[in-house]
Design a protein with these regions (language model features):
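Serine-esterase "nucleophile elbow" of acetyl-processing enzymes
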Residues: 1-58, 63, 68-77, 183
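Alpha-helical cap/lid subdomain in secreted, periplasmic
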Residues: 36, 40-42, 48, 64-227
Length: 227
């Protein structure tokens, strides 16, 4: 295994409330679990070789994320970035007469621009995630449930990942192994049934951690080869 002593790596977790870990103690959030696992695996002798920033903001869409991107990502110049948005983008408010908060076309464009900007500022590896299943089946003002719309926006995520050649972490597929009657244990109870529970964060962390481990190992090997 490569030694972390050869590289100083910054990772930014960029996203909405799912990345922020809303309503769950910070020690139980998937970003904290992943950070702890990476530190245990790659840091030696108690020295700090890695820097982690959670830049998840509750309630935000890709449009709002793009507006704060210079401050929250570009300024950090991370080697690795995780990118997760969509559950707010696909939502349809009554006050918008059924229109999504962010259209499918704009959602796609916003993801691509964030990827382009991250790369321009030196990000070597980008992990783009689909969004997990929820139990939000009530029909929204636009005529579809949040669950139906989530699936549409997840397809956009997959298409963007393929087109931009970033790493796809298919969280939806990772949760597909969970029986429908057990999904409620992965989510906060009614009336939420959208945000991840402690068990949900653990499952999410297990799905995304291998991608980040490969990113870190790739960077460390490149640093050692250049030394």
């Amino acid at each position: 295994m490569p030694s972390a002593q050869s590289a100083s790596i910054t990772i930014v977790y960029m996203g909405d409330s799912i990345t922020e870990g809303q309503y769950v103690h910070h020690s139980l959030r998937w970003t904290t679990l992943v950070t702890a696992a990476l530190r245990r695996q790659y840091e030696a002798g108690g020295s700090e070789f890695h820097f982690f920033f959670n830049r998840g903001v509750s309630g935000e869409t890709t449009r709002q994320g793009l507006e704060r991107f210079p401050r929250d990502v570009q300024n950090a110049r991370p080697e690795v970035m995780t990118l997760q948005f969509g559950l707010n983008d696909c939502n349809c408010w009554d006050t918008d007469l059924g229109l999504p908060r962010v259209s499918e076309a704009a959602y796609r464009a916003n993801l691509v621009e964030m990827i382009d900007r991250a790369r321009r500022f030196g990000t070597r590896h980008i992990v783009l995630s689909t969004n997990h299943p929820t139990l939000r089946h009530r029909v929204l003002a636009g005529g579809q449930s949040l669950e139906t719309r989530r699936k549409h926006y997840n397809e956009i995520v997959r298409e963007v990942a393929a087109a931009t050649r970033v790493i796809l972490c298919d969280i939806e597929q990772a949760f597909a192994t969970i029986a429908p009657e057990q999904l409620k244990d992965m989510l906060l109870p009614e009336p939420d049934v959208l945000h991840l529970s402690q068990a949900g964060h653990q499952h999410y962390a297990a799905a995304i951690l291998p991608h980040l481990q490969r990113c870190v190992e790739n960077i460390i090997r490149r640093e050692e080869s250049a030394a």
